[in-house]
Amino acid sequence: MTTHILFKGGPNSWEEYEIPLSNALKKTGLEYHLAEDISPEQVDYIVYAPSSRLNDFKPYTRCKAVLCLWAGVETIIGNKSLTMPLTRMVDSGMTQGMVEWVTGHVLRHHLGTDAHVIGQDGVWRNAIPPLAKDRTVTVLGLGALGVACATTLAGLGFSVRGWSRRPKTIENIATFHGEDGF
């Protein structure tokens, strides 16, 4: 029996995902039909990105799960028409990549790197940034990726604060939650 997998990503993301998803599915030995357009009553699974235009899941009566391409699911989790299980993507590569990207940009701003790169006018700028321990960094969102970034920055000596919807306790990070904590 063929498993019907509907891909609903953001604009132009089909070109990026079609081949890798097809290759991964072939390795499973599963008989499948992966496409951007499948009749709702035939869909077994939806591969989904919150940037897609799909926001009504009611017609997908046979759908067993929505497989989110992103770690963040805050834009879909409250959708009343989403009655099937929802998964989110978290893998070590995504986490490591996000940690590197965030750390790089925090250090870029902390050290004032842009002033040195852009200021190629021959004038020496003797600006000395504060030590990391004297700089506060706040992470808004303490999901898997946010916690990984926050703990890395705390490990570099930054004073780190973090906010989440629900209470969390994270070593070396001052945490706040809910509307009152924002």
Q: Where are the regions that the model predicts?
A:
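N-terminal glycine-/charge-rich "phosphate-binding" loop or analogous flexible N-terminal tail
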Residues: 1-44
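Short, structured coil segments at secondary-structure junctions
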Residues: 28, 61-62, 80-83, 156, ...
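Residue-level detector of anion-binding/catalytic polar loops
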Residues: 31, 85, 159
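Short acidic low-complexity segments
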Residues: 31-42, 55-56, 171-182
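Short, polar loop motifs at secondary-structure junctions
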Residues: 35-37, 50-54, 70-74, 162-169
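Phosphate/diphosphate ligand-binding glycine-rich loop within oxidoreductases
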Residues: 44-119
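A short, basic/flexible loop-to-alpha-helix module at the beginning of a structural domain
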Residues: 120-130
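Rossmann-like dinucleotide/phosphate-binding beta-alpha-beta segment
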Residues: 128-182
